[in-house]
């Protein structure tokens, strides 16, 4: 891959949420079909994307990515990934995180977890039961949040004051689309609502930003 392979277009920020009470940072972000979940360090917060109101709070550590498999939450916490019952907040199982504390984003797709490696500039597909690495995708940027939507793999980047949303090929890692965030609007966590929005964690801003997802298109060859 080269830096000039795909030119970026400006990301369209539709709405901002937060900061939330008692939370000065947002790490991972996921969407359960109704609520947006944000990992804020000591707690997981679920909020209504229509009203912006906080609906649930779980006392669970979350210092990086968050994912949802349709039933359970998965949360990067230090050097592990916790499988959490969102109804009770109980941790049902834990596996070692592949980066041993250096992990960033987290997503669920194809029956597996996809884990962003920030400084290693990689995305790993891992077995959700064992943590075994099934696939490695190389990036040429620091990787933050990771999201899968309609078969498309997207990840956030964060270098200095610049962040992008990138659509990449799941086999080669080639960059297919780039959405550039305004300077200073950085991306930590990332998740799609399954429709036309991405929810982007804003790191130390304590905010979550809704960004317009581009219409799905056939990748150019």
Where are these regions (language model features)?
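Beta-rich, blade/repeat-based domains predominating
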Residues: 20-33, 60-70, 98-110, 140-150, ...
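Short loop/turn segments that connect beta-strands within beta-propeller blades
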Residues: 48-52, 85-89, 127-131, 169-173, ...
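Conserved beta-strand positions in repeat-built beta-propeller and related beta-rich domains
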Residues: 37-42, 73-79, 115-120, 155-160, ...
């Amino acid at each position: 891959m080269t830096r000039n392979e795909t030119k970026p277009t400006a990301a369209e920020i539709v709405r901002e949420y937060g900061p939330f009470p008692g939370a000065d940072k947002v790490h991972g972000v996921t969407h359960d079909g109704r609520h947006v979940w944000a990992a804020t360090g000591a707690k997981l917060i679920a909020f209504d994307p229509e009203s912006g109101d906080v609906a649930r709070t779980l006392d669970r550590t979350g210092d990086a990515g968050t994912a949802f498999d349709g039933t359970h939450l998965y949360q990067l916490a230090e050097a592990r990934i916790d499988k959490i019952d969102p109804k009770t907040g109980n941790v049902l199982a834990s596996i070692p995180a592949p980066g041993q504390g250096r992990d960033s984003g987290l997503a669920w797709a194809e029956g597996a977890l996809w884990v962003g490696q920030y400084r290693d500039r990689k995305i790993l597909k891992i077995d959700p039961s064992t943590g075994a690495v099934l696939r490695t995708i190389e990036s040429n940027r620091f990787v933050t949040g990771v999201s899968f939507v309609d078969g498309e793999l997207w990840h956030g980047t964060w270098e200095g004051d610049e962040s992008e949303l990138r659509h990449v090929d799941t086999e080669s890692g080639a960059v297919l689309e780039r959405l550039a965030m305004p300077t200073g609007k950085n991306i930590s966590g990332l998740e799609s609502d399954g429709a036309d929005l991405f929810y982007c964690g804003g790191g130390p801003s304590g905010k979550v930003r809704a960004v317009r997802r581009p219409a799905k298109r056939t990748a150019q060859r």
